[in-house]
């Protein structure tokens, strides 16, 4: 039986170790990380795509598949996802200076989403780039690209609600580890190329999902 109380207590303890200020040099390699599931959840799949900066060209990618170690439990998703992320991380020849994770960082009820959890374990600066809100509230967001509002939870800012593209739902940007909230938003902005997602997590999602466009791009950039 899974001791969810112990896992929540572990989250609270690990959240105290998260560094919420800039602790990195200007990155030359920036990665995106994405996690999915296969065989009705029996297999966890993690993809990490490493891009050069500022060109944002693919340098390396790795995919790891492992047996799923934990069922889906709301608020404890990082325990389900980090083992595959760490497996993919270990496969990388070129370790990135900054990683954007498809998921939340400190924008989490106990301030430890998958971006923060992975950042702590890998000791790498990370940013949470999530497609859906997990907790917190914000003021009404403008429709124009670049519109931004603080994401607040009990008067504490835990992230940004940021509209990256017109007529698209916003992204939820947060500190993962070793980066400030302001810098997290800045670096996501710097990795945009006109799509809803930054190139980092767009590549990771495309590779993990075997999308035809990314397969063609990989063939051109072996």
From Swiss-Prot:
<keyword id="KW-0234">DNA repair</keyword>
<dbReference type="GO" id="GO:0043737">
    <property type="term" value="F:deoxyribonuclease V activity"/>
</dbReference>
<feature type="binding site">
    <location>
        <position position="102"/>
    </location>
    <ligand>
        <name>Mg(2+)</name>
    </ligand>
</feature>
<keyword id="KW-0460">Magnesium</keyword>
<dbReference type="GO" id="GO:0016891">
    <property type="term" value="F:RNA endonuclease activity, producing 5'-phosphomonoesters"/>
</dbReference>
<dbReference type="GO" id="GO:0000287">
    <property type="term" value="F:magnesium ion binding"/>
</dbReference>
<keyword id="KW-0378">Hydrolase</keyword>
<feature type="site" description="Interaction with target DNA">
    <location>
        <position position="72"/>
    </location>
</feature>
<keyword id="KW-0479">Metal-binding</keyword>
<protein>
    <recommendedName>
        <fullName>Endonuclease V</fullName>
        <ecNumber>3.1.21.7</ecNumber>
    </recommendedName>
</protein>
<comment type="similarity">
    <text>Belongs to the endonuclease V family.</text>
</comment>
<dbReference type="GO" id="GO:0006281">
    <property type="term" value="P:DNA repair"/>
</dbReference>
<keyword id="KW-0540">Nuclease</keyword>
<dbReference type="InterPro" id="IPR007581">
    <property type="entry name" value="Endonuclease-V"/>
</dbReference>
<dbReference type="GO" id="GO:0003727">
    <property type="term" value="F:single-stranded RNA binding"/>
</dbReference>
<dbReference type="Pfam" id="PF04493">
    <property type="entry name" value="Endonuclease_5"/>
</dbReference>
<keyword id="KW-0963">Cytoplasm</keyword>
<comment type="function">
    <text>DNA repair enzyme involved in the repair of deaminated bases. Selectively cleaves double-stranded DNA at the second phosphodiester bond 3' to a deoxyinosine leaving behind the intact lesion on the nicked DNA.</text>
</comment>
<keyword id="KW-0227">DNA damage</keyword>
<dbReference type="GO" id="GO:0005737">
    <property type="term" value="C:cytoplasm"/>
</dbReference>
<keyword id="KW-0255">Endonuclease</keyword>
<feature type="binding site">
    <location>
        <position position="34"/>
    </location>
    <ligand>
        <name>Mg(2+)</name>
    </ligand>
</feature>
